[in-house]
Amino acid sequence: MIEADRLIAADNPTFREEDVIDRAIRPKKLDDYQGQDHVRGQMEIFIKAAQMREEALDHLLIFGPPGLGKTTLANIVANEMGVNIRTTSGPVLEKAGDLAALLTNLEENDILFIDEIHRLSPMVEEVLYPAMEDYQLDIMIGEGPAARSIKIDLPPFTLIGATTRAGSLTSPLRDRFGIVQRLEYYKVEDLQHIVQRSADCLNLSMESEGALEVARRARGTPRIANRLLRRVRDYAEVMSDGNISSDIADKALNMLDVDVRGFDYMDRKLLLAIMEKFDGGPVGLDNIAAAIGEERDTIEDVIEPYLIQQGYLQRTPRGRIVSDRAYLHFGIDKPDK
């Protein structure tokens, strides 16, 4: 798997030791939340309305690509509502009892945040339905003919679910969310503000042009922007006086093999393989996987989304095709067909 080795992977387990820094630079209030203007505007209204009625916020589903701030938004909602938040993830909730234990410990108007909610087991989902709809738990006691169902009343609460795959949610679960928010890739100017704010939180000396250079190469993703910032900081401290200028940021990012479009080695390897080995496509995913020595799931879930979103790669019924933009980026003449 390449994901653990990619500096620009939006979800990279090798960088979990820096979670403490991530938490320090995460915004705590909607006023500090950069970008996603449509989401921020709507959530301000929904939160104020719930506070005026002195009731729990409606259940909220947040979906979008990795690294765009789903967990951050969930914590901001809890801070704005002035309530506690309990955090878990779909794969962790293996049994109905795991979910029941969390729900019965919630206080009135608290938030339960389930990351990767699309990975909940059907058994756990069945327990979640009445909890979301009626604030009740239906628990089976005993086995066989002696089994019986008991109902446990729950305090009003808010479930916030986060997923990168909204289409994988079952319809009954998806329909129980009263608020659904999609997070989009960030504009460069919004990412520049995020990078500058993170630099200020870390007490770094950073010029606005340096922040812009990092933002340009962050693939529209705050998590990647903050990760690149930390590596640029390392370069600036060792190779210069610690100040992050545009020139220092450019040299650091080039050293990290992140080009002006935010592409890394694997992005370029995939595009070049299609251009040089398959005449630009169409080519099937299995052939690409064999050509670059990578698993098809990793290509589909990790490498391709940004290339497609930026218009360098297309998925067609006949296979993958690189666009004219890709040929221009690499300075390669497009073959006549």
Curated annotation (Swiss-Prot):
SUPFAM superfamilies tied to this protein: P-loop containing nucleoside triphosphate hydrolases, Winged helix' DNA-binding domain
Catalyses which reaction(s): ATP + H2O = ADP + phosphate + H(+)
Keywords: ATP-binding, Cytoplasm, DNA damage, DNA recombination, DNA repair, DNA-binding, Hydrolase, Nucleotide-binding
Residues the record lists as binding ATP: 25-26, 67, 70-72, 133-135, 176, 186, 223
Binding site for Mg(2+): 71
Gene Ontology BP term (one): DNA repair
Annotated region (Head domain (RuvB-H)), positions in chain: 260-337
Residues binding DNA, per UniProt: 296, 315, 320
Stored Pfam families: AAA_lid_4, RuvB_C, RuvB_N
Database matches in InterPro entries: AAA+_ATPase (IPR003593), AAA_lid_4 (IPR041445), DNA_helicase_Holl-junc_RuvB (IPR004605), P-loop_NTPase (IPR027417), RuvB-like_N (IPR008824), RuvB_C (IPR008823), WH-like_DNA-bd_sf (IPR036388), WH_DNA-bd_sf (IPR036390)
Region (Small ATPAse domain (RuvB-S)): 187-257
Keyword DNA repair among UniProt keywords: yes
Region (Large ATPase domain (RuvB-L)) location: 4-186
CDD domains registered for this protein in UniProt: AAA (cd00009)
Compartment list: Cytoplasm
Principal EC category: hydrolase
CC annotations in GO: cytoplasm; Holliday junction resolvase complex
EC number: 3.6.4.-
GO terms of molecular function: ATP binding; ATP hydrolysis activity; four-way junction DNA binding; four-way junction helicase activity
Domain of life: Bacteria
UniProt comment concerning the protein's domains: Has 3 domains, the large (RuvB-L) and small ATPase (RuvB-S) domains and the C-terminal head (RuvB-H) domain. The head domain binds DNA, while the ATPase domains jointly bind ATP, ADP or are empty depending on the state of the subunit in the translocation cycle. During a single DNA translocation step the structure of each domain remains the same, but their relative positions change.
Its biological purpose: The RuvA-RuvB-RuvC complex processes Holliday junction (HJ) DNA during genetic recombination and DNA repair, while the RuvA-RuvB complex plays an important role in the rescue of blocked DNA replication forks via replication fork reversal (RFR). RuvA specifically binds to HJ cruciform DNA, conferring on it an open structure. The RuvB hexamer acts as an ATP-dependent pump, pulling dsDNA into and through the RuvAB complex. RuvB forms 2 homohexamers on either side of HJ DNA bound by 1 or 2 RuvA tetramers; 4 subunits per hexamer contact DNA at a time.
Subunit field text: Homohexamer. Forms an RuvA(8)-RuvB(12)-Holliday junction (HJ) complex. HJ DNA is sandwiched between 2 RuvA tetramers; dsDNA enters through RuvA and exits via RuvB. An RuvB hexamer assembles on each DNA strand where it exits the tetramer. Each RuvB hexamer is contacted by two RuvA subunits (via domain III) on 2 adjacent RuvB subunits; this complex drives branch migration. In the full resolvosome a probable DNA-RuvA(4)-RuvB(12)-RuvC(2) complex forms which resolves the HJ.
Family (UniProt): Belongs to the RuvB family.
Family annotation (PANTHER family): HOLLIDAY JUNCTION BRANCH MIGRATION COMPLEX SUBUNIT RUVB, PTHR42848
The protein, known as: Holliday junction branch migration complex subunit RuvB
